[in-house]
Design a protein with these regions (language model features):
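Active-site/catalytic core of tyrosine-dependent DNA strand-transfer enzymes
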Residues: 182-246
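C-terminal catalytic core of tyrosine-transesterase DNA break-rejoin enzymes
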Residues: 236-280, 295
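Basic, Lys/Arg- and aromatic-enriched nucleic-acid-binding interface segment
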Residues: 114-142, 265-271
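DNA breakage-rejoining catalytic core of tyrosine-based enzymes
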Residues: 100-120, 173-185
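Alpha-helix N-cap/helix-start motif at helix boundaries, enriched for small hydrophobics
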Residues: 79, 142-148
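N-terminal core-binding DNA-recognition domain of tyrosine recombinases/integrases
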Residues: 7-103
Length: 296
């Protein structure tokens, strides 16, 4: 039966906490029950039978039941894990495509983390360099691990390169993008990354490791360093870019002023630019990174 096989799928994955696994098992039992209630023969289904129509039916049921957006998003994450485990990630569309509303929480408190007081010399050099790339270019964790300097430079020399290119297969939602090179520290980190990639076979992942095994090690190391999932490095990049482009600090790091009409227009333009550099496509998400002048 589908519910039993889904529970077994969870048991086969031993890289996550017991709490996460238990929560996922409970959700999978619910999914199987709801699919059966909606006419699917779960006795003949296996986890590999997951299709878009099953996802759509579950989503339809949750909306009918008045389930909160937060809970729906958690359930969608479980469905994406299922799809990934059976190598059928296309079965579950993005939240945007499924019209699951976005929530943006603005606190005007900085969530940035800095590498300045962290000793990276004692950890794996590949992980250390990925962290520096995240810090310098605002990369996501996966992007920093899969980063291939030769591809990213797009035929440019490091000394006079104007931008880097991120391959769609490295990125969230397969949205490739370019990020400008605006300071010498970025060039310094590109040189280090380039030299390391030569040893690794192209990326920041050791050639003897798969992405999955390297990611597991990466998570253990960053947890021990106290930087969590490293998302705070992207916050730091966004805040530094805002200062660089606007000439004064953003609200999240204590910026306080009454913007002129010209500054309001420039603020909007720069927030959209930073949003694109971070791999987003909407301006309101930047309030999470930069804060909001309206909350001052």
């Amino acid at each position: 039966m589908l519910d039993y096989q889904l529970v077994q799928l969870c048991k086969d994955n031993r890289k996550e906490s017991k709490a996460t696994t238990a929560n996922r098992r409970a959700m999978f039992r619910l999914f199987a029950k709801q699919l059966e209630e909606n006419g699917y023969n779960i006795r003949k289904m296996t986890p590999h039978d997951l299709k878009g129509r099953h996802v759509n039916k579950l989503l339809e049921q949750w909306r009918k039941d008045g389930i909160s957006t937060a809970t729906i998003k958690n359930r969608m994450s479980a469905l994406r894990w299922w799809a990934k485990e059976i190598n059928n990630e296309g079965a579950v569309k993005s939240n945007v495509e499924l019209n699951i509303e976005r929530r943006v929480f603005v606190t005007n408190e900085s969530k940035a983390i800095s590498l300045e007081n962290i000793d990276l010399s004692k950890i794996d050099e590949n992980i250390a360099q990925s962290l520096r790339l995240q810090d310098s270019f605002g990369l996501r964790r996966e992007e920093s691990m899969k980063f291939q300097p030769e591809f990213a430079l797009d035929g440019q020399w490091i000394d006079n390169a104007k931008y880097i290119v991120l391959k769609p297969t490295w990125t969230k939602g397969k949205r490739g993008r370019t990020i400008p090179i605006s300071n010498e520290n970025q060039r310094k980190e590109l040189r280090k990354a380039y030299a390391l990639a030569q040893k690794n076979g192209g990326s920041m992942i050791p050639k003897e490791k798969s992405y999955k095994s390297h990611k597991s090690n990466f998570e253990s190391v960053t947890h021990a360093l106290g930087v969590g999932q490293t998302h705070g490095l992207r916050h730091g990049y966004a805040q530094t870019r805002y200062l660089e482009l606007m000439g004064f600090d953003c609200p999240a790091v204590g910026g306080f002023r009454s913007l002129t009409s010209e500054e309001i227009a420039k603020d909007k333009e720069i927030r959209m630019l930073i949003s694109e550099e971070l791999g987003h496509s909407r301006i309101n998400i930047t309030s999470v990174y930069l804060g909001s002048w309206s909350k001052k």
